[in-house]
Amino acid sequence: MNFNKLKFGDTIGIIGGGQLGKMMAQSAQKMGFKVICLDPNPDSPCKSVAHEFITAAYDDEEALHELGEKSDVITYEFENISAEQLIRLTQKFNIPQGYQAIQLLQDRLTEKQTLQKAGSKIVPFLPIKEEKDLNVVINQLGYPFIVKTRFGGYDGKGQVLVKNEESIQEAKDLISQQECVAEQFLDIALEVSLTVTIGNQKQITYFPLQENEHRNQILFKTIVPARSDKEQEARDEVNKIINEVHFVGTFTVEFFIDKSNNLYVNEIAPRPHNSGHYSIEACDYSQFDTHILAVTGQNLPKEIEILKPAVMMNLLGRDLDLLEDKFANHPEWHVHIYGKPERKPNRKMGHMTILTNNVDETEKAMLKQFEGRE
């Protein structure tokens, strides 16, 4: 991969105008780059910060071509862009990330097969094309198991836990919609993730291991550094993956740690990730900074310095009234509100990060402030 080193004033095109696109744009602008964004929602968060905004569907070939013509480099904030369209774009325009990661990882089955080929430690899985395949799953994996759709799904959507024969109907309903993947259920002690940036000359920069807690399948909070001894093992797993998949820019690998302290790769997000948002305040470079450095052909920092341990919490729609009531009395809360036009109870509307020398006490105090949060 040949990198074009961008200069001040050059333009970065971003496919996707959500909060990740917005935070990419903010990092790009402080480095002197211009930003043009494409998103079908005319009120998406990135519109408020982009120099230019194209309101168009992600599969609008003419609009994507316009984005390419106006940009010196193109990046993307999410993995659900059509791989076929991305292939065509890479033939005409400068897209250092390429299409392979998207092509492999937007399908849960090819993602699992890729991890298997890389030698990653993953839980046993089986493909499900139709309802009758559940018999094979029950015989080989046994109860309980998780059924996930091959395509789409985020924040727990598109997946069901099958505990026994009585709970299998929900899985059948999911399979009737599209092909799925079944995974053996894992008794999880801890969830962690590792955010990584790859740049020119195969430079690689690791962020600290992140400890995550999900509630109702949505990331609730992240603690950094993770209270785990698995950081080096997680890096080793990432190194296996990058030998198999082409990455440029920031991506995140999510892991499970079971109750016997075994580490398993869960999934890969080929772009900046929710669990890395703490890095904006807690590190000398954020995950968005390093992403922009990578796609614009600049050198990456050799190491990421944690300025202070941190607790990051997602802010959902139902949290905002409470936040507004208490925010004035908590200057230690670094609050980011994304600017989404519609507030929904379970929708990510922002996040906040607290820097601390006592993670345990800060975590308890934060939970007390948002008591009753599920």
Curated annotation (Swiss-Prot):
**By its UniProt entry, which PROSITE patterns does this protein fall under?**
ATP_GRASP (PS50975)
The protein's enzyme class: ligase
The UniProt entry's GO CC annotations, sorted and at most eight, read: cytosol
Question: Which residues are noted in the entry as ATP-binding?
Answer: 108, 148, 153-159, 183-186, 191, 214, 266-267
Q: Which InterPro entries match?
A: ATP-grasp, ATP-grasp_carboxylate-amine, ATP_grasp_subdomain_1, PreATP-grasp_dom_sf, PurK, PurK_C, PurT/PurK_preATP-grasp, Rudment_hybrid_motif
- In which pathway is this protein known to take part? Purine metabolism; IMP biosynthesis via de novo pathway; 5-amino-1-(5-phospho-D-ribosyl)imidazole-4-carboxylate from 5-amino-1-(5-phospho-D-ribosyl)imidazole (N5-CAIR route): step 1/2
- Catalysed reactions, as listed in the record: 5-amino-1-(5-phospho-beta-D-ribosyl)imidazole + hydrogencarbonate + ATP = 5-carboxyamino-1-(5-phospho-D-ribosyl)imidazole + ADP + phosphate + 2 H(+)
Limits of the ATP-grasp domain: 112-296
Q: List the disulfide bonds.
A: none
Q: What is its EC number?
A: 6.3.4.18
GO MF, one term, reads: 5-(carboxyamino)imidazole ribonucleotide synthase activity
Keywords, ordered alphabetically: ATP-binding, Ligase, Nucleotide-binding, Purine biosynthesis
Gene Ontology biological process terms, A to Z? 'de novo' IMP biosynthetic process
Q: Determine if ATP-binding is one of this entry's keywords.
A: yes
Family the UniProt entry places it in:
Belongs to the PurK/PurT family.
- Record note on quaternary structure: Homodimer.
Function of this protein?
A: Catalyzes the ATP-dependent conversion of 5-aminoimidazole ribonucleotide (AIR) and HCO(3)(-) to N5-carboxyaminoimidazole ribonucleotide (N5-CAIR).
Q: What is the recorded name of this protein?
A: N5-carboxyaminoimidazole ribonucleotide synthase
Q: Which organism is the protein's source?
A: Staphylococcus haemolyticus (strain JCSC1435)
Q: What is the gene called? A: purK
